[in-house]
């Protein structure tokens, strides 16, 4: 008997359109002899769209208005065997939709409330992973009220790290709101931007040399496996939003040309991060590798990475011998297995 799958896409984050592209790929890849798939697009306003508007959004990529409030439509997930929440960023990848589905008792692809929420928040990720000795660059936390009332304290923290440094909102994805700050004169503008997007901000030291950006895919629940290591190459100072989503600005190299011992260490660190954060199903774990010194630093853990057929995560497992269709099928199996 076919399994009934509810595929959620769109959402309220900056990655709404990326999610729609991923959903089109997954929708085409799930074997029709095994699954009966119903897509539902969530609008940027948080509304669950009816079938005709969902189809239009998937075909055109346009941000459609209208639809029902999420709680009014949550009951519509009843009767499905599993949900594939192909949502990125806040209100999709941060434990919110996972909490709703958990309350409803419906299995879903990906990490649960804890793994999703902690991995989405850069501060919590760093603090939890520090407890297991995960290598990370030096960083400091600042909150909006401190910046408004005691800006000299925030400036002092930046001075402790030294310049240049990065300023990042603590709980946004897709490189939104990130600034490279070359000196004290650029700090105010960067902090104002980051605090306009959230109340908590991370100040993060830069590595001594421009690092290579390495990525590893993780697949599984309590016995996860790691993919080969991939590398992103680009000319920009860092992997910002424009570089990430402008075709031709970055290239993928799978497997990354690395000494075998470095590649194996990256994979082992990625598995440690996945287990420590209590992730499930899938994740893409990103690292900085400073070739000149041999240093590795964990950058972030992405619990619902981009999922088009040309995205890094599926390409990593394709290199391991798992086709795109086999990968999405396995993710649904893992969702059903976990509960």
UniProtKB/Swiss-Prot annotation:
Keyword S-adenosyl-L-methionine annotated: no
Gene name linked to the record: ddl
Record PROSITE patterns: ATP_GRASP, DALA_DALA_LIGASE_1, DALA_DALA_LIGASE_2
Gene Ontology terms describing biological process: cell wall organization; peptidoglycan biosynthetic process; regulation of cell shape
NCBIfam families (UniProt xref): D_ala_D_alaTIGR, PRK01372.1, PRK01966.1-4
Family annotation (InterPro entries): ATP-grasp (IPR011761), ATP_grasp_subdomain_1 (IPR013815), D-Ala_lig_Van_CS (IPR000291), D_ala_D_ala (IPR005905), Dala_Dala_lig_C (IPR011095), Dala_Dala_lig_N (IPR011127), PreATP-grasp_dom_sf (IPR016185)
Lineage of the species this protein comes from: Bacteria, Thermotogati, Deinococcota, Deinococci, Deinococcales
Name this polypeptide is given: D-alanine--D-alanine ligase
Localization of this protein: Cytoplasm
Cross-referenced HAMAP family: Dala_Dala_lig
Gene Ontology MF terms in the entry: ATP binding; D-alanine-D-alanine ligase activity; metal ion binding
Residues reported to bind Mg(2+) 2: 300, 302
Family: Belongs to the D-alanine--D-alanine ligase family.
Main location: cytoplasm
Enzyme class: ligase
Reaction it catalyzes: 2 D-alanine + ATP = D-alanyl-D-alanine + ADP + phosphate + H(+)
């Amino acid at each position: 008997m076919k399994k009934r799958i509810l595929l959620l896409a769109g959402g309220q984050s900056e990655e709404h359109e990326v999610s729609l592209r991923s959903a089109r790929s997954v929708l085409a890849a799930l074997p029709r002899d095994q699954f009966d798939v119903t897509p539902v697009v969530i609008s940027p306003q948080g509304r669950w769209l009816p079938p005709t508007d969902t189809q239009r959004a998937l075909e055109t990529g346009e941000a459609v208005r209208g639809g029902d409030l999420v709680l009014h439509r949550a009951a519509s997930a009843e009767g499905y065997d599993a949900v594939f929440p192909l949502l990125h960023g806040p209100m999709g990848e941060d434990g919110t939709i996972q909490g709703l589905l958990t309350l409803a008792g419906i299995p879903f692809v990906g990490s649960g409330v804890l793994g999703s929420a902690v991995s989405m928040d850069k501060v919590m990720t760093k603090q939890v992973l520090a407890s297991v000795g995960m290598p990370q660059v030096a960083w400091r936390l600042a909150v909006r009220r401190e910046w408004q009332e005691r800006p000299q304290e925030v400036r002092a923290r930046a001075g402790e790290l030294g310049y240049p440094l990065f300023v990042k909102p603590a709980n946004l994805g897709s490189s939104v709101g990130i600034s490279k700050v070359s000196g004290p004169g650029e700090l105010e503008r960067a902090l104002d931007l980051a605090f306009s997007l959230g109340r908590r901000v991370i100040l993060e030291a830069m590595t001594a040399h421009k690092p290579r950006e390495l990525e590893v895919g993780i697949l599984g629940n309590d016995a996860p496996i790691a993919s080969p290591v991939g590398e992103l190459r680009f000319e920009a100072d860092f992997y910002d939003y424009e570089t990430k989503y402008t075709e031709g600005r970055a290239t993928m190299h799978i497997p990354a040309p690395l000494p075998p011992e470095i590649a194996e260490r990256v994979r082992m660190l990625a598995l440690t991060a996945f287990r420590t954060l209590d992730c499930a199903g899938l994740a893409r774990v990103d690292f900085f590798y400073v070739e000149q010194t041999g240093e590795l630093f964990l950058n972030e853990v992405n619990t619902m990475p981009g999922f088009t057929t040309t995205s890094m995560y599926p390409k990593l497992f394709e290199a391991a011998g798992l086709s795109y269709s086999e990968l999405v099928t396995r993710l649904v199996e893992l969702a059903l297995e976990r509960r």
